[in-house]
Amino acid sequence: MSQTELIKKLREATGAGMMDVKRALEDAGWDEEKAVQLLRERGAMKAAKKADREAREGIIGHYIHHNQRVGVLVELNCETDFVARNELFQNLAKDLAMHIAMMNPRYVSAEEIPAEELEKERQIYIQAALNEGKPQQIAEKIAEGRLKKYLEEVVLLEQPFVKDDKVKVKELIQQAIAKIGENIVVRRFCRFELGA
């Protein structure tokens, strides 16, 4: 594959600008995977700069599963109504709603989890490791690892994205921020399941 074709391929895959893609490829020695990683890191840096800006516009994304037994509403905010009408933004809202329907998170971010719940889970994991005969220090390290897994189960932003499990939901949002150029925030969601 020529350099030009590689640049074009990465632009389409990442939504990054041509010069950003070219720089990332040059920095990565024209290694496609390393370049994608660099673009993701740089996208995250762009996203971090925009994170302080207030997001008050947006849409309510929705998804009803084909069996009509699971439905989701998700409030996705951005800075301007222009972006709220953007197809990329609207598709992100729909994808997030579908993800929530499939993965059933309980919280948007780790900050929403009550401290008592986190400590309770941590103590359960420590006790389980101690019951397996592990020393206290090792048990605490094991508990931290299991707590990280727990966060991936219950926190939307920490979950691997249902359409591409190599990307966490928060990274997907950072990529969208980098492409759109505005802060994007998942404000809240509500998941309904028949009989649950």
UniProtKB/Swiss-Prot annotation:
Keyword set, alphabetical order: Cytoplasm, Elongation factor, Protein biosynthesis
CDD domains with a match to the protein in the record: UBA_EF-Ts
Ubl conjugation listed as a keyword: no
Cysteine disulfide links: none
Chief location bin: cytoplasm
Residues in coiled coil: none
GO molecular function: translation elongation factor activity
Cellular compartment(s): Cytoplasm
InterPro entries: EF-Ts_dimer_sf, Transl_elong_EFTs/EF1B, Transl_elong_EFTs/EF1B_dimer, Transl_elong_Ts_CS, UBA-like_sf
Record keyword Protein biosynthesis present: yes
Region (Involved in Mg(2+) ion dislocation from EF-Tu): 80-83
GO cellular component: cytoplasm
One matching Pfam family: EF_TS
Function (record text): Associates with the EF-Tu.GDP complex and induces the exchange of GDP to GTP. It remains bound to the aminoacyl-tRNA.EF-Tu.GTP complex up to the GTP hydrolysis stage on the ribosome.
Family membership noted in the UniProt record: Belongs to the EF-Ts family.
Protein name: Elongation factor Ts
Species for this entry: Thermus thermophilus (strain ATCC BAA-163 / DSM 7039 / HB27)
